[in-house]
A protein has these predicted regions:
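Short helix-perturbing small/polar motifs within transmembrane alpha-helices
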Residues: 1-27, 35-133, 155-227, 249-278
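Short aromatic-rich membrane-water interface segments that cap or initiate transmembrane helices
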Residues: 137-149, 255-258
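Hydrophobic transmembrane alpha-helices of multi-pass small-molecule transporters
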Residues: 151, 236-239
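Signal-transducing coiled-coil linker helices
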Residues: 207, 252, 257-296, 303-315, ...
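Juxtamembrane non-transmembrane "cap" segments at the membrane-aqueous interface
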Residues: 226-234
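Transmembrane alpha-helical segments of integral membrane proteins
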Residues: 241-244
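Conserved long alpha-helical elements within nucleotide-processing catalytic cores of c-di-GMP signaling
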Residues: 288-292, 298-324, 331-358, 366
């Protein structure tokens, strides 16, 4: 666990360092949300050794790239302050909200990220004044908007990422089963990103909004989070580099902060839609299961059994295949209810259904 934290934070910090424009802090800093997501998904990593390994990883990434040692300690303290406050607040949420599976989960996440970035900006804003001779309030605002963007675009991906086996299976099934028109939102999203770069202009970062919303109503939450991540990371770096428009002398920081906040608000739209869709799909799945299966034995309900049996018989008859049907009865079941009560009868039914399912499963498997 300690090595996992150190490796993840070190790699993410190096990536952020390489995105630093001249004279500014990193335009994309994934180390903080990556560390926060690791701790949320695996709370057992939140140990003194885990926090020390994260601190060492932050320091090592800055030092090997030539940063001043005292500045590095200050920046690391600011980063850890934001992550620690965010982790403590996320621990107060139910597990479903931590994995962004409820309609209000994105709202909770946004509020926690705001508080976490306020904590980190309070500690780190002085660095901006020392390094770049900016006003303290300007340094606070610049740090706050930058860190907030990083949290909003990275956390949803990291918190909803499925396991490697489930992700591989989902990708394979998606290629086999997804209808061709289901790829249209992804194509529209890619084209909108390319169009924003080619056309340019002050409003180019907003060109992908319709495509992102289309993806949000068509795809699972994790894939929507990936699209949002790609959009926001790309737009943040392009805006910070001045590709879309030239900054007015002396007003570059204000322009960058304004666009960063706009990107955050844009990202919240499709993420909220995807979160609501995920909650709706889960509810529909539970309702369908309640209709199709008996709540006690988890076997097919009478109506579902009759429908499936009728369809199976008709299909096998159409292909000239025979069908064997057997009926099973529990002897003296009424006596169990009369003598021991309906609770004992329910337990007997559950045990019988489980035993029957196990026997039939073995028979099917050979």
């Amino acid at each position: 666990g300690v090595l996992l934290i150190a490796a993840a934070v070190f790699a993410a910090a190096l990536l952020g360092i390489f995105t630093r424009p001249m004279g500014l802090l990193a335009s994309f800093w994934p180390a903080n949300p990556v560390l926060l997501a690791l701790l949320i998904r695996r709370p057992g990593l939140s140990t003194p050794a885990g926090w020390v390994s994260a601190c060492i990883a932050y320091l090592a990434a800055d030092i090997i790239t030539g940063a001043n040692i005292w500045t590095t300690f200050w920046l690391t303290g600011a980063n850890l302050a934001g992550v620690a406050s965010g982790f403590l607040l996320f621990q107060q949420l139910p597990r479903a909200d931590q994995r962004l599976r409820r309609p209000l989960s994105i709202t909770y996440m946004f509020g926690i990220c705001v508080i976490a970035t306020v904590c980190s900006a309070t500690v780190g804003s002085s660095v901006t004044k020392i390094l770049y001779d900016r006003e303290l309030l300007t340094g606070f605002a610049f740090w706050f908007t930058g860190d907030l963007v990083n949290f909003i675009i990275v956390l949803p991906v990291a918190l909803t990422m499925p396991s490697r086996a489930r992700l591989s299976a989902a990708i394979r099934n998606g290629w086999r089963q997804r209808a061709s028109w289901d790829w249209f939102p992804a194509f529209a999203f890619i084209l909108s990103l390319a169009g924003s770069v080619v056309v340019g202009g002050a409003g180019a970062f907003a060109y992908s909004v319709p495509a992102l919303l289309w993806c949000a109503v068509r795809y699972d939450f994790f894939y929507v989070a990936c699209c949002s991540f790609l959009y926001c990371a790309l737009q943040t770096m392009i805006v910070s580099s001045g590709w879309y428009f030239s900054f007015v002398d002396g007003d570059a920081l204000n322009s960058i902060m304004s666009v960063r906040l706009a990107i955050v608000l844009i990202a919240l739209g499709p993420l909220s839609v995807a979160s609501i869709n995920a909650a709706r799909d889960e509810l529909i799945s539970r309702l369908e299961h309640a209709v199709r299966y008996d709540f006690l034995t988890n076997s097919l309900s009478r109506r579902e059994f009759m429908e499936q049996a009728t369809n199976t018989l008709a299909e096998r008859s159409l292909h000239g295949k025979g069908t064997a049907i057997f009926l099973v009865d529990i002897d003296h079941f009424k006596a169990i209810n009369d003598r021991y009560g309906h609770g004992a009868g329910d337990r007997a039914l559950v045990a019988f259904a489980s035993r029957l399912a196990a026997i039939l499963g073995r028979a099917v498997l050979g």
